[in-house]
Amino acid sequence: MTAIFDTHAHYDDDAFNEDREQLLAALPGQGIARVVDVGASLASCRKVLELMEQYDYIYGAIGVHPSETAELTEESYSWLKEQCQKEKCLAVGEIGLDYYWPEPDHETQKKWFLRQLELAREIKKPVIIHSRDAAKDTVDLMTEAHAEEIGGVIHCYSYTKETAKIFLDMGFYFGIGGVLTFKNAKKLKEAVEYIPMDRIVLETDCPYLAPEPNRGKRNSSLNIPYVIAAMAQIKGITEEEVRKAAWDNSLKLYHMER
């Protein structure tokens, strides 16, 4: 059975403070072979750096989430750039636009999204894009920055299959997690049916977005088999075919040889 690559997790989150070491020590024995722990704020990026040093199978992504961009300065941007170049840092992220909340203002978010896209281009690493209620501006800024030359993943994909075509044409991957198992996720299921299997990677976004039957509880990489089962059903292929494709795609996404 092909191992699982969780392409997007937040084990640095406070939700794991009580049992983090115990949980992370157990994952490899449960078929979770690789995890990318993803930064969201400057503080969480520091924790990501610690985790990727501490565990062989954990890699990092360093970047500032749109909701945290108000804290960015030229000085902290320079620090980000330095950390992103570490060997075990596989991507710049998570970066993007989030218009669900009123703050930070859209111009601040756009400014730092573009700057972090430029950073990824400069250091030749892919990006992990967070986009919520901001499809048009995300596409426009990615087009402006020639994101097709940078590459990366649209994490926790939540838009239509029509929007998926635009990201596919840019050569991006799609991160799919627990939401796929939700009864009300009709739009996502249609998008996953449409997106070719060679463009899909698995993720948790843990501790958030646990799949059914654990919806509402703390998520972890151990829940990915529920997502695999849902995807196999939608795609009309076996669970092993989903595992194998997702593993191979994850290696390509993050420029890993094996």
Model regions: which residues?
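Mid-domain alpha/beta scaffold segments of enzyme catalytic cores
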Residues: 1-258
